[in-house]
Amino acid sequence: MVSRKRNSVIYRFASLLLVLMLSACSALQGTPQPAPPVTDHPQEIRRDQTQGLQRIGSVSTMVRGSPDDALAEIKAKAVAAKADYYVVVMVDETIVTGQWYSQAILYRK
């Protein structure tokens, strides 16, 4: 009797957990948004703002300093490539303390 009751509780808890996890997944999917108007310098955008833009390549950097230094280097490379927008894919510290690796995808209108 106790085992059957415990199985029922576990089954209900597992069902509730599954429903909560599935609803959380839908919260992560963003609906496409338009990119901001083009300016004279590249702008960082989110992944859901890339619809309708032309991908022109990707860039990566490895710098000593801080994450802000890595992002500044990404922006400088986007300027050199004459990109209108860029999406930062990752900024991560390497095994070496103070050395940062970053990647971004470049887009044009």
Curated annotation (Swiss-Prot):
Q: Which family does it belong to?
A: Belongs to the BhsA/McbA family.
| Superkingdom of the organism of origin | Bacteria
Q: Which SUPFAM superfamilies match?
A: YdgH-like
- Give the protein's biological function: Involved in protection of biofilms against oxidative stress.
**UniProt keyword Mitochondrion present:** no
Gene Ontology CC: plasma membrane
Gene3D superfamilies listed in its UniProt record:
Flavin-binding protein dodecin (3.30.1660.10)
Residues with S-diacylglycerol cysteine lipidation? C25
Q: Which gene encodes it?
A: bsmA
- Enumerate the UniProt keywords alphabetically: Cell membrane, Lipoprotein, Membrane, Palmitate, Signal, Stress response
Pfam families in the record: YdgH_BhsA-like
Output one GO BP term. Answer: response to stress
UniProt note: phenotype after gene disruption: Mutant exhibits reduced microcolony formation and greatly enhanced flagellar motility. Biofilms from the mutant strain are less able to resist acid and peroxide stresses.
Sites of N-palmitoyl cysteine lipid attachment are C25
Q: How does it sit in the membrane?
A: Lipid-anchor
Induction line: Up-regulated in biofilms.
Record's InterPro entries? Answer: BhsA/McbA_stress_biofilm_assoc, Dodecin-like, YdgH-like_sf, YdgH/BhsA/McbA-like_dom
Q: What protein is this chain from?
A: Lipoprotein BsmA
Which residues constitute the signal peptide according to the record? 1-24
List the subcellular locations.
Cell membrane
